[in-house]
Design a protein with these regions (language model features):
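Bacterial Sec-dependent N-terminal signal peptides
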Residues: 1-24
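Short beta->alpha linker loops
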Residues: 171, 191-192
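Phosphate- and divalent-cation-binding pockets in alpha/beta enzyme and binding domains
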Residues: 195-199
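ER/secretory pathway lumenal C-terminal domains and tails of membrane proteins involved
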Residues: 20-182, 200-387
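Short His-Asn-centered micro-motif
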Residues: 187-191, 215
Length: 387
């Protein structure tokens, strides 16, 4: 793999906080992450609120989210029958708060598959309570999979106008897209490297040439994948790909696609699960916030240098516009640690070329980001690098 500074790319880690005695707001886990113990504690606290008032929408919202994000029991084993438990919460909500935004939204969120979403109820909820931006993610997801491009654009514009997506996430996704060549394929992993990218493309007409494929959406919706590729004048047979697991599916897709379209470049977002990245380890080359797939050896450091110095938008990394209390600040700072890998690989490359001054410049930029996130292990590793 074309990557010298061997720090693992990060997605999002949990923040461990001491459990409070009073219930706190439970944010979407893609926006703010807490420890498993924190979610268990909040679920118990919000349940107490519901025992006093079963018509409390805020309590239902936070209770459901907390229960949804509890992944492990006290003994450390994965929670069993989790979906059954969540289904039970939705059933209780239908009894106590049936004609409410909270019930309609969480019913959609609880769907086990996008095809099970009651789109009529979802749209009705949005029309009646348009101030709630979080429902827009489900509306974009449903219409993206169903292929209703006009509605995707409409809701993407609404989401952009709402400013619900943290500015740092938009900047990160913009740089992810800017790391790719025109007309390429980009595989993404989750909400934070997919929704902001789609919003930039659909609402801001930014790098629309890139075909963004969320691996989980594509694996579970083969018709959607086929239509998405056809929109960009590409055609393969996704139904022939593995239905066993995502890793096999992705490996077969890359082989099939690169055989049929050798002139199209495939990229893997740095935020992809390590399991998927490891599949192609010998054929992936770091060129920015993405890995470029290539069957032949390439000098990726020339591309990396060009991207960093000419193509990427990096000013925001040294200017933190939000204070510590902004909910998404820890998430954005943690995600921005991926730039450390970029800077340190570039620094080592420049040092080998004899450009010590420029190498130290990028080393210092990496150190600045590590200090922002207070990652002591990474700070030490950067300081140990001698240029």
């Amino acid at each position: 793999m074309g990557c010298r500074f061997l720090l693992v790319f990060v997605f999002i880690c949990a923040n461990v906080l001491t459990a409070a005695d009073k219930p706190e707001q439970v944010y979407r886990i893609t926006y703010v992450q807490k420890s498993n113990e924190w979610y268990k504690n909040q679920a118990a606290l919000w349940e107490k609120v519901l025992l006093q008032d079963k018509s409390n929408e805020e309590a239902w919202m936070n209770f459901y989210k907390a229960q949804r994000y509890v992944k492990f029991n006290d003994d450390g084993h994965i929670v069993e029958n989790r979906q059954k438990r969540l289904d039970g919460i939705i059933t209780e909500m239908k009894k106590h708060i049936p004609d409410t935004y909270t019930y309609f939204y969480l019913s959609a969120l609880n769907a086990k598959h996008v095809n099970e979403i009651d789109i009529g109820s979802l749209e009705n909820a949005h029309n009646r309570w348009p101030e709630h931006a979080e429902i827009l993610y489900e509306l974009i997801l449903f219409n993206e999979v169903k292929g209703d491009k006009d509605k995707v654009i409409h809701y993407a514009r609404e989401l952009y106008a709402s400013e619900d997506i943290a500015r740092g996430l938009l900047e990160y996704n913009a740089n992810m897209l800017l790391s790719t060549q025109p007309g390429s394929i980009l595989f993404t992993n989750g909400d934070n490297d997919t929704y902001p990218a789609l919003v930039l493309q659909k609402a801001c007409l930014f790098r629309e040439d890139v075909t963004v494929i969320n691996v989980h959406m594509a694996f579970g919706n083969r018709e959607y994948l086929a239509k998405l590729l056809e929109e960009h004048n590409m055609k393969i047979m996704p139904h022939q790909l593995s239905k066993t697991n995502i890793a096999d599916f992705l490996g077969e897709f890359v082989n099939m696609f690169s055989e049929k379209y050798p002139d199209k470049t495939i990229y893997m977002a740095a935020t992809l699960n390590k399991e998927y990245i490891d599949l192609f380890q010998e054929n992936l080359y770091l060129v920015g916030l993405v890995y470029q797939y290539s069957r032949t050896r390439m000098d990726n450091f020339i591309v990396l240098k060009e991207n960093v110095q000419k193509n990427l938008r990096l000013d925001y990394l040294s200017r933190d516009w939000y204070n510590e209390k902004y909910p998404a600040t820890p998430l954005v700072r943690h995600l921005n640690q991926n730039f450390i890998v970029i800077y340190m690989n570039l620094a080592e490359y420049l040092a080998e070329k004899g450009d010590i001054g420029e190498a130290q410049y990028y080393q210092n930029r990496a150190l600045q980001l590590a200090n922002q996130s207070d990652n002591q292990k990474m700070i030490q590793k950067i300081k140990e690098s001698q240029f």
